[in-house]
Amino acid sequence: DGIRWLLLDSLEEVNKVPGILGTAQLDWVARELDSAPATPAVIFVHHNVEPVDMGLKDTKALLEVLRPRRQLKCIFFGHTHEWRRFAVDGIHMVNLPAIGYAFKKGEPVGWVRGTPRAAGLTLELRSLDGAHPDHGKKIELEWRANGEGGKRVGRF
């Protein structure tokens, strides 16, 4: 019962912007998810999952591993210093805000409080600037069902 929290290392090379997971970690994720198919799981990784120059080089391979494993519910990532959310094939993609400084004016700096629920997760933005318009706002993530197909929402 509960949620499985899987942490991945996407650093390929120090002082280089893009990241990579590689075959060994992708195989490990598949084995870990396969060992508990009924338990919801989430992944944390530093690099953004969008297939862009500054993100994960192997996003396509990661999604090929995750799409059929319906117990994977969400990927949390950072790297872009943006607070946003979208979904790909029912998998929530949560881009966490920067905790030190924002790249773009208006982006919150802070952290996100996560509260597990039976069929999802409640996220609450905690901005260092209590006057930020998104400070304290909550987002309800609903888990995709283990056996259902997911619709694609997002850019990849």
Report each predicted region and the residues it spans:
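A cross-family glycoside hydrolase active-site/sugar-binding cleft signature
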Residues: 9, 44-46, 96, 124
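Acidic/histidine-rich helix-loop elements
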Residues: 12-23, 102-106, 140
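Binuclear metal-dependent phosphoesterase catalytic core
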Residues: 84-156
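Short histidine/acidic/glycine/proline-rich micro-motifs that form metal-
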Residues: 12, 48-52, 99-101
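Formylglycine-dependent
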Residues: 2-3, 10-12
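His/acidic metal-ligating clusters that form di-metal
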Residues: 4-6, 16-92, 146-155
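Short strand-connecting beta-turns/loops that link adjacent beta-strands
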Residues: 2, 38, 117-119
